[in-house]
From Swiss-Prot:
Gene source species: Saccharomyces cerevisiae (strain ATCC 204508 / S288c)
Organism placement in taxonomy: Eukaryota, Fungi, Dikarya, Ascomycota, Saccharomycotina
Entry's Gene Ontology BP terms: eisosome assembly; endocytosis; protein localization; protein localization to eisosome filament
Pfam families (alphabetical): Pil1 (PF13805)
Function: Negative regulator of cell wall integrity (CWI) in unstressed cells, probably by inhibiting protein kinase PKH1/PHK2 activity and regulating their downstream CWI pathways PKC1-MAP kinase pathway and protein kinase YPK1 pathway. Activity may be regulated by the transient increase of sphingolipid long chain bases (LCBs) during heat stress.
Protein's recorded name: Sphingolipid long chain base-responsive protein PIL1
Length: 339
């Protein structure tokens, strides 16, 4: 992994950040207990302190992801309360502000519903990682047994090289190594298949969640277009608000767009830089085929002129003469080549 894009190094600013510099960090970040609460820190440290040695790191990751789910659930609940409060606040304002804030509250409430759905799908990713952890935990005993037998053999060879137990332990070591090989192969296969399945769950859910939120944001901006923000002078009256039907239709369209969205209709597609290199490599095979076709066409043209078939027949005859005559082949070959 390139260091510029590694977790161990800070990233270069993006084009969006260069165009619009990001705001300063929020004042509420880590205000009381740093980056996580006391319960979060305890769960994280406890997950890596117990269980088989092989599965401790993944156990810690699974526990951290559980904390992520709890944080997202808290965010969804808070967003739902914020949507309700926005609608309550707008109720006491003018007709246009009241209607727009009510509809915006509906959209923000829908975002919280999408957060709940995302949590359910994200949990499938965590459970799949958890299955890898369980497999790692089952492989650890076979490793420990093999290491224990190896240590016993080394101890006996040092203390009593003639001990009859050494041969018995060596046979047990062969069986333990065979069992360990089978377990390691299963772990290798399951790790790869489960890892792909887990992150497919996560990335598919991220794509769906982000694109649906982008849809909601687009319809929210359409609602804002109905709000007249032109300044008025003191004593001037604003025109009567007539956007009730339009705002209602925007909500209906948003609901329809969310219901009809599928993963196949995702708008954002990745652009891979190495794909072009692969495409550049492909025509080389086509060029070889074209060269072969060109040679075939050239041979056909030559055969029409009678310039290829006769020398081949003469060469075959020369080979036969070489097998039969031997010494006369040296005389016949120059004649055939000149012919």
């Amino acid at each position: 992994m390139h260091r510029t894009y590694s977790l161990r190094n800070s990233r270069a600013p993006t084009a969006s950040q260069l165009q619009n510099p990001p705001p300063p960090p929020s004042t509420t970040k880590g205000r009381f207990f740093g980056k996580g609460g006391l319960a979060y820190s305890f769960r994280r440290s406890a997950a890596g302190a117990f269980g088989p040695e092989l599965s401790r790191k993944l156990s810690q990751l699974v526990k951290i992801e559980k904390n992520v789910l709890r944080s997202m659930e808290l965010t969804a609940n808070e967003r739902r309360d914020a949507a309700k409060q926005l609608s309550i606040w707008g109720l006491e304002n003018d007709d246009d502000v009241s209607d727009i804030t009510d509809k915006l509250g509906v959209l923000i409430y829908e975002v919280s519903e999408l957060d709940d759905q995302f949590i359910d799908r994200y949990d499938q990713y965590r459970l799949t990682l958890k299955s890898i952890r369980d497999i790692e935990g089952s492989v650890q005993p076979s490793r420990d047994r093999k290491d224990k037998i190896t240590d016993k053999i080394a101890y006996l060879k040092y203390k009593d090289p003639q001990s009859p137990k050494i041969e018995v332990l060596e046979q047990e070591l062969v069986r333990a190594e065979a069992e360990s090989l089978v377990a390691e192969a299963q772990l290798s296969n399951i790790t790869r298949s489960k890892l792909r399945a887990a992150f497919n769950y996560q990335f598919d859910s991220i794509i769906e969640h982000s694109e649906k939120i982008a849809l909601i944001a687009g319809y929210g901006k359409a609602l804002l277009e109905l709000l007249d923000d032109s300044p008025v002078t003191p004593g001037e009256t604003r025109p009567a608000y007539d956007g009730y039907e339009a705002s209602k239709q925007i909500i209906i369209d948003a609901e329809s767009a969310l219901n009809e969205w599928t993963l196949d209709s995702a708008q954002v597609k990745p652009t891979l830089s190495f794909k072009q290199d692969y495409e550049d490599f492909e025509p080389e095979e086509g060029e070889e085929e074209e060269e072969e076709d060109g040679q075939g066409r050239w041979s056909e043209d030559e055969q029409e002129d009678g310039q290829i078939e006769e020398p081949e027949q003469e060469e075959e005859g020369a080979v036969e003469e070489h097998e039969q005559v031997g010494h006369q082949q040296s005389e016949s070959l120059p004649q055939q080549t000149t012919a």
